[in-house]
């Protein structure tokens, strides 16, 4: 997944959940655990759905290889005491169908496909026997992965010569 797609998803999820952008982080980043509410994101299972479609670009000899690609985005919501992270994620899942959000995703070249069932991961922490309200959901998305290449193909060939009977000829391809 490219950086622009990551940034778009990060910022959109923060907006849809009504959180500051600093409260949404990519999983496995170095640093300390932030104050709740906190959302972690992890993208995995990225897979091309078909062979790449090779299209010429505006630059001579350059081609863009475009592949429709699916991936899963795990969203974990760590809530405050007395909150219900399952409800927050349920709201997040429903919002991907809003016309304004659909416009945003289309402009970013991303499509929301579906969400797996939300899991309530609330559990006891440490010896204090305090509950940590937490829930997770896997969101499935599609985007077009693009790789640009200049394979060095010969686009044009000109051959000039003479035949035994002195006939001039030119071949262009």
Indicate residue ranges for each PLM-predicted region:
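Oligomerization/assembly interface segments of phage tail-like spikes and tubes
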Residues: 65-81, 90-92, 133-143
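Small/polar-rich, solvent-exposed N-terminal microdomains that initiate assembly or binding
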Residues: 1-60, 155, 159-173
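Hydrophobic secondary-structure block in the mid-to-C-terminal portion of proteins
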Residues: 131-173
């Amino acid at each position: 997944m490219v950086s622009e797609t990551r940034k778009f998803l990060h910022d959109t999820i923060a907006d849809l959940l009504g959180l500051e952008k600093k409260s949404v982080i990519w999983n496995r980043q170095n640093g300390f655990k932030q104050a709740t509410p906190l959302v972690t994101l992890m993208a995995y299972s990225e897979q091309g759905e078909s062979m790449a479609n090779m299209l010429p670009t505006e630059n001579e000899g350059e081609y863009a290889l475009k592949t429709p690609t699916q991936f899963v985005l795990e969203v974990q919501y760590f809530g405050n005491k007395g909150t219900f992270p399952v409800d927050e994620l349920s709201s997040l899942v429903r919002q991907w169908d809003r016309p304004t959000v659909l416009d945003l995703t289309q402009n970013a070249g991303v499509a929301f496909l579906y969400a797996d069932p939300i899991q309530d991961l609330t559990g006891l922490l440490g010896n204090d026997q305090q509950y940590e309200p937490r829930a997770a959901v896997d969101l499935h998305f599609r985007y077009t992965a693009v790789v640009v290449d200049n394979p060095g193909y010969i686009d044009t060939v000109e051959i000039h010569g003479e035949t035994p009977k002195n006939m001039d000829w030119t071949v262009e391809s």
